[in-house]
């Protein structure tokens, strides 16, 4: 960890000194050391060779350098004594430790922000104001190409680094190694390269060219196009610098990686060296993109020609129109820029879910405008937001007037044609509905007409895909056979019901998918009506006679609702078959009138309910939601427990009272039986009622109770309890006189157990007095001996 921190600090200070040397200014090593004298530093020593050696892209000679640093003392610090050198080392160590480190663990190079070399807005001294290099610059890339594209076996000497950078590196490594000394060695190769580079030292063009190579993402032969692109982008950046969108566009367009390492990688490179694949793209990307905090990670040199994975988010739109898109090596950038540049282009309606569903089968005409339109009719109840209509009141009035004209023209239509319109098939109703919509939309503006036509096409496609909902739209006759005799009254009703008249479309939307409709609309099988909408009572005329002037909700409320919802519930289909039965004599379909002869039960129930519950707000709900059928609601569990205990206690008390009453009745019956006041009457007719039996036997006296028990075998009987015993004896003696000519004789007994047994039983109470043990003797007991002997002889002869 200490070695990593040491390397980071040394690299940071080394980069600061190197950039200062490139700029050509005598800058202090650190702002905290103003007393450091760097006047003896020769800037001319920083030629291309030494600069390339200082960058240390490939650190194959790092060990050689570290060994050579220990040979000779430094030439720059000859005038500094050892005490000052020790103090300087301590201050440098403290300063290097205080350098900021970014999120990736690398020191941030703030010193480059003041230079004119790393910014593309300020080109190198040799470049023209418009960003194009001078003509003599065409020969210079050849030297750099030789240096950058040197073969792997070529050994570049890093010993010719500037004394300042080398001393700084050595001083920092002093914390880990021995006190390093800096030596400046020269060999034949370095002298030759230095002599070549010294011819161009006054202009410092190799350094500027090197920076151009460092900041480009293309191959070295593409240096000039890259400069042109960078210049144009820099101009755009300077004009739009205040906009963050422009900055993120520059981040996309600017290349931020190096194309090639300064020295080619050799097979024997030490991969574990701290200087492996060192790049300065992080510093350059900070300056070029214009966003100081956005520093993407370093891209390896072998991925230089691939797409930049750290481009900005594509959601940001470009505001700079002068940026030249990158070449074909980055097609994603150009595509995203071209797509994001069209700010006015919105997501087309053809990408909606409805279009995605319909486009699978056929292509609709006018596909761009028809999905933007919404339903051209008002909605009575709430629906989904994407289905609600936002038409103006003018179109509603036009549709109302058109419907009035159609209804007046077809006023005298025959009832037979009306019946035929009711039983037409769903396919014919679709075609009639489309024709009626086209005719009713002629007087509307062309825009609304086109919208309605497109809406009809969408509906036709929906019917084709998902099946036609039964009677979802009006029939041809059902839309046009309304009769309005009183125009003032009709206009009043139309003003109350504007949503039912818009060429049939509102009726579709009315019964689509609103859950509240089940509570607000009326059901013919339920006998209810929605009186929150219609406050005019039905006619009081006979229910089986057609009354054209009767005022009631439109027929569409009662018939179209269950027909529309047949697919959702089977009860709706049952009502559909019932509502079209012959019990319904005539069915007018105008919102102003309806035949009151739908069915006997329906009219009676609805008429009675309307009279009794007309102004009741609870009547809007269904009958099943009456207050009597609702369970009580409790505020707390304790209240529920209390109510439950009360109910149980009441039930126990009721059962106790009932048992007491039953016991009392049983005691009274037993007492009446003991008192001989109960008479059993048997063999009565099966059709005899209790009232008839009571009336016939009441001639003998006052009767307290009379019951009749009927049996399947015809042996019916009854019990009559008289108030007095004497009346019971009179009925027992003279009851046979009440028999009619077509009846059998009554069996009259005093009530007891004996009437429930058969008469041939020997243990019956009625036969107890006649029982005699002697009666069981045979006929032979009365014969004498001679008679018995003769009988025996006759039996033997047989």
Curated annotation (Swiss-Prot):
CDD domains: RRM_PPARGC1A. Phosphorylation by AMPK in skeletal muscle increases activation of its own promoter. Phosphorylated by CLK2. Heavily acetylated by KAT2A/GCN5 under conditions of high nutrients, leading to inactivation of PPARGC1A. Deacetylated by SIRT1 in low nutrients/high NAD conditions, leading to its activation. SMART domains: RRM. GO terms for molecular function: chromatin DNA binding; DNA binding; DNA-binding transcription factor binding; lncRNA binding; nuclear receptor binding; RNA binding; RNA polymerase II-specific DNA-binding transcription factor binding; sequence-specific DNA binding. Residues 293-339 are annotated as: Interaction with PPARG. Heart, skeletal muscle, liver and kidney. Expressed at lower levels in brain and pancreas and at very low levels in the intestine and white adipose tissue. In skeletal muscle, levels were lower in obese than in lean subjects and fasting induced a 2-fold increase in levels in the skeletal muscle in obese subjects. SUPFAM superfamilies: RNA-binding domain, RBD. Residues 100-140, 213-277, 290-351, 542-599, 613-639, 650-669 are annotated as: Disordered. Keywords: Acetylation, Activator, Biological rhythms, Cytoplasm, Nucleus, Phosphoprotein, RNA-binding, Transcription, Transcription regulation, Ubl conjugation. It comes from the Eukaryota. InterPro entries: Nucleotide-bd_a/b_plait_sf, PGC-1, PPARGC1A_RRM, RBD_domain_sf, RRM_dom. The modification N6-acetyllysine is found at residues 79, 146, 184, 254, 271, 278, 321, 347, 413, 442, 451, 758, 779. Residues 350-798 are annotated as: Mediates interaction with RNF34. Residues 563-578, 622-631 have a biased composition (Basic residues). A motif (LXXLL motif) lies at residues 144-148. One of its GO terms (cellular component) is PML body. Coiled coil: none annotated. One of its GO terms (biological process) is fatty acid oxidation. Residues 219-237 have a biased composition (Basic and acidic residues). PANTHER family: PEROXISOME PROLIFERATOR ACTIVATED RECEPTOR GAMMA COACTIVATOR 1 PGC-1 -RELATED (PTHR15528), PEROXISOME PROLIFERATOR-ACTIVATED RECEPTOR GAMMA COACTIVATOR 1-ALPHA (PTHR15528:SF10). Homooligomer. Interacts with MYBBP1A; inhibits MYBBP1A transcriptional activation. Interacts with PRDM16, LPIN1 and PML. Interacts (via LXXLL motif) with RORA and RORC (via AF-2 motif); activates RORA and RORC transcriptional activation. Interacts with LRPPRC. Interacts with FOXO1. Interacts with NR5A2. Transcriptional coactivator for steroid receptors and nuclear receptors. Greatly increases the transcriptional activity of PPARG and thyroid hormone receptor on the uncoupling protein promoter. Can regulate key mitochondrial genes that contribute to the program of adaptive thermogenesis. Plays an essential role in metabolic reprogramming in response to dietary availability through coordination of the expression of a wide array of genes involved in glucose and fatty acid metabolism. This is Peroxisome proliferator-activated receptor gamma coactivator 1-alpha. It comes from Homo sapiens. The lineage of its organism: Eukaryota, Metazoa, Chordata, Craniata, Vertebrata. The gene is PPARGC1A.
């Amino acid at each position: 960890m200490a070695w990593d921190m040491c390397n980071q600090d040394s690299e940071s200070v080394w980069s600061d000194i190197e950039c200062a040397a490139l700029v050509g200014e005598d800058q202090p090593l650190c702002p905290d050391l103003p007393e450091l004298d760097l006047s003896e530093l020769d800037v001319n020593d920083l030629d291309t060779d030494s600069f390339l050696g200082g960058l240390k892209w490939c650190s194959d000679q790092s060990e050689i350098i570290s060994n050579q640093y220990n040979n000779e003392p430094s030439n720059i610090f000859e005038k500094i004594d050892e005490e000052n050198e020790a103090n300087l080392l301590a201050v440098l160590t403290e300063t290097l430790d205080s350098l900021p480190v970014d999120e990736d663990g690398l020191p941030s190079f703030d010193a480059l922000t003041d230079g004119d070399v790393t910014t593309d807005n300020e080109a190198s001294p040799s470049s023209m104001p418009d960003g194009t290099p001078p003509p003599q610059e065409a020969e210079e890339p050849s030297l750099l190409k030789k240096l950058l594209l040197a073969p792997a076996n070529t050994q570049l000497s890093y010993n010719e680094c500037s004394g300042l950078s080398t001393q700084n590196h050595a001083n920092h490594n002093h914390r880990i190694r021995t006190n390093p000394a800096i030596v400046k060695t020269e060999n034949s190769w370095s002298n030759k390269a230095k002599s070549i580079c010294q011819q161009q030292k006054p202009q410092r063009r190799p350094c500027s060219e090197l920076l151009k190579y460092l900041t480009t993402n293309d191959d070295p032969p593409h240096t000039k196009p890259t400069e042109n692109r960078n210049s144009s982008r820099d101009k755009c950046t300077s004009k739009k610098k205040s906009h963050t969108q422009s900055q993120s566009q520059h981040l996309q367009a600017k290349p931020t990686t190096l194309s090639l390492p300064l020295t080619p990688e050799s097979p024997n490179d030490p991969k574990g060296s701290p200087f492996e694949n060192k790049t300065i793209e992080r510093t350059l990307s900070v300056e070029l993109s214009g966003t100081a905090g956005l520093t993407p990670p370093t891209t390896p040199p072998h991925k230089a020609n691939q797409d930049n994975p750290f481009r900005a988010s594509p959601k940001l739109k470009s505001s700079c129109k002068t940026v030249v898109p990158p070449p074909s090596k980055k097609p994603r950038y150009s595509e995203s820029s071209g797509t994001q540049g069209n700010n006015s282009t919105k997501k087309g309606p053809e990408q909606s879910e409805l279009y995605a569903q319909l486009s699978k089968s056929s292509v609709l005409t006018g596909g761009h405008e028809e999905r933007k339109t919404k339903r051209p009719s008002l909605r009575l109840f709430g629906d989904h937001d994407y289905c609600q209509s936002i038409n103006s009141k003018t179109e509603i009035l036009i549709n109302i007037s058109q419907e009035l004209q159609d209804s007046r023209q077809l006023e005298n239509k025959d009832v037979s044609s009306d019946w035929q319109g009711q039983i037409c098939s769903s396919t014919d109703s679709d075609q009639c509905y489309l024709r009626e919509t086209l005719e009713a939309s002629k007087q509307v503006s062309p825009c609304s007409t086109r919208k309605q036509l497109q809406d009809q096409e969408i509906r036709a496609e929906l019917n084709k895909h998902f099946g036609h909902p039964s009677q979802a739209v009006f029939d041809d006759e059902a839309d046009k056979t309304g009769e309005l005799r009183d125009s003032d009254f009709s206009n009043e009703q139309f003003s109350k019901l504007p949503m039912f008249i818009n060429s049939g479309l509102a009726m579709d939307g009315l019964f689509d998918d609103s859950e509240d409709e089940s509570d607000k609309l009326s059901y013919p099988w339920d006998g209810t009506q929605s009186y929150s909408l219609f406050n005019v009572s039905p006619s009081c005329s006979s229910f089986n006679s057609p009354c054209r002037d009767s005022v009631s909700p439109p027929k569409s409320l009662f018939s179209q609702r269950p027909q529309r919802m047949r697919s959702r519930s089977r009860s709706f289909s049952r009502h559909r078959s019932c509502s079209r039965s012959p019990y319904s004599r005539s069915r007018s379909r105008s919102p102003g009138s309806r035949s009151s002869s739908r069915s006997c039960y329906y009219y009676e129930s609805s008429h009675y309910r309307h009279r009794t519950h007309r102004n009741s707000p609870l009547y809007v709900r269904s009958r099943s939601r009456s207050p009597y059928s609702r369970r009580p609601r409790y505020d707390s569990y304790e209240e529920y427990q209390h109510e439950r205990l009360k109910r149980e206690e009441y039930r126990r008390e009721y059962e106790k009272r009932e048992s007491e009453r039953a016991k009392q009745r049983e005691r009274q019956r037993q007492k009446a039986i003991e008192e001989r006041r109960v008479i059993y009457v048997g063999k009565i007719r099966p059709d005899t009622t209790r009232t008839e039996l009571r009336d016939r036997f009441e001639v003998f006296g006052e009767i307290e109770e009379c019951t009749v028990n009927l049996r399947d075998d015809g042996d019916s009987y009854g019990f009559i309890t008289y108030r007095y015993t004497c009346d019971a004896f009179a009925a027992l003696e003279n009851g046979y006189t009440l028999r009619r000519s077509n009846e059998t004789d009554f069996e009259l007994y005093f009530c007891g157990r004996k009437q429930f047994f058969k008469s041939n039983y020997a243990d019956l109470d009625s036969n107890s007095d006649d029982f005699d043990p002697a009666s069981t003797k045979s006929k032979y007991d009365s014969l004498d001996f001679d008679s018995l002997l003769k009988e025996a002889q006759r039996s033997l002869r047989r």
